[in-house]
Amino acid sequence: YKIFNIESARSLPNLPEGHPCKNIHGHSFKIKITVMGAVNEETGFVMDFSEIDSAFSPIFKMIDHAYLNELDGLTNPSSENLCKWIWAKLIDSLPNLKRIEIKETESTGCIYEGKIHG
């Protein structure tokens, strides 16, 4: 797996009035991208970490220091929806993708294991 640190702002518009997360607020997200597969006998890797970096780089540029609600497909950017959104953007370039985990604080987060590609 590889962990990326993202600074982003969001609001969760579908929450009831008075809920603090309905307001614009920020998080220092930790996004953990996990791949799974057989170990390549020659390299000793399941996947080179640089491949994960390359696949995630365009997404990182979109979401780091961004207001997530303004991104296409993220009008309600809960951590769960952000996981699904990232999965959809990564699965074609990372067919061994197994799991996306997002921590929004040290004690809260979510894990998404979407459909396996193919």
Language-model segments: which ranges?
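Charge-rich, low-complexity N-terminal segments
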Residues: 1-118
